[in-house]
Amino acid sequence: VNEAIRTAYEQKGVAVVICPNDLLTEKIKDTTNKPVDTSRPTVVSPKYKDIKKAVKLINKSKKPVMLIGVGAKHAKDELREFIEMAKIPVIHSLPAKTILPDDHPYSIGNLGKIGTKTSYQTMQEADLLIMVGTNYPYVDYLPKKNIKAIQIDTNPKNIGHRFNINVGIVGDSKIALHQLTENIKHVAERPFLNKTLERKAVWDKWMEQDKNNNSKPLRPERLMASINKFIKDDAVISADVGTATVWSTRYLNLGVNNKFIISSWLGTMGCGLPGAIASKIAYPNRQAIAIAGDGAFQMVM
C-alpha cells in the first residue's frame, strides 16, 4: 500500500492494489518495512536553448493555438500573461477547465467529443501547436496535418508521445511560460485570433439559446444555468460520468478559484457524490457541488 501511494504521487495518477480473494481473510505477521519520507526537487528548470528554439517558432507562427492540461494548474498567471502577449487562443483538456477562466476572451473551450466546435476548427487550421502540461490522449482531435509543435512537460516521456514535436521543453510550466513571455515579440493584432473569436461568439450564442430554453420537461441545460447562479467563486464542482459531464463542462461558467473534479478518461461512474463529500472534508469552508445523473447517484447510495 505504501508503494502504491508513492507511485500515485510520483506518476500523478491512480495506483491499483490487487489482492487474491482469499488473502484478506488470512492473518499474517506484519513484516513490512516502515516507509521512509523522501523528497526530490519538484521544480525542473527548462534548458534555455530549448526556450530560444520555441521562441523562434512562436515569433514565426501566424496561426498558433495552445492546448493546456493540469500540468499548467500552478502557472495560471504566467499562462495569462503569455497568451495576452502573443495573442494566442487557448484550448483546455477537460480536467484543466479552471486553469483559465471560462469567460477569458481567449479561452475557446475544451477539445474532444464533448468539446466546442470552435476548438476543433481552430486546432485544424493552426500552423503551430503549443502543448503545456498535457499528454492529451485523444489524438484524433489533434491537427490532421503535419504542423510545427512545441510541448512543455516535466516528464520527458510525455514529449512527443502523442504528436510529432519540433521543440520539447522539459521543465516546469510556470518557469517555461515566464521565460517565453520575456523573449517573444509582442503581437498587437493577430487575424487568426480574431477569426477564432468570431467563431466563439457564434458558439456562445448557441449555448445561451440552450440555457434559455424554457420548454417542458425541464431541460438539463437550463438547470445548469440555474445552478451557475448559485456557484461561489471558490466552489468545488464534482462532475460524474455520463451526460452530467457534458452539462457541467459546456454550461457551467467557472473561474480560476474554482476546482473542477472529474474522473476523466477513467470513466468511473458514481464518482460525483464521493468527490463532493471528499471536497467538503478537504475544504470545509468552501461550497461543494456534485453534478450526477440518476444512474450514477444510485450506484453509490
Question: Where are the regions that the model predicts?
Answer:
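Glycine-rich, acidic loop regions that bind phosphate or pyrophosphate groups
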Residues: V1, A96-K195, I291
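Short glycine/serine/threonine-rich phosphate/pyrophosphate-binding segments
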Residues: K73-D77, G133, P137-Y141, V246, ...
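Short beta-strand segments
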Residues: V17-P20, L67-G69, M131-G133, D153, ...
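Glycine-rich phosphate/diphosphate-binding loops and the adjacent beta-loop-alpha structural elements
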Residues: K62-A75, I83
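Glycine-rich phosphate/diphosphate-binding loops that line cofactor/substrate pockets in enzymes
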Residues: V1, I5-Q11, D50-P64, F82, ...
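Structural signature of the thiamine diphosphate
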Residues: V1-N33, L57, Y120-K148, Q179, ...
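Short internal beta-strands
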Residues: I18, I88-P95, I150-D153
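Active-site diphosphate/adenylate-binding microenvironment
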Residues: K200-N285
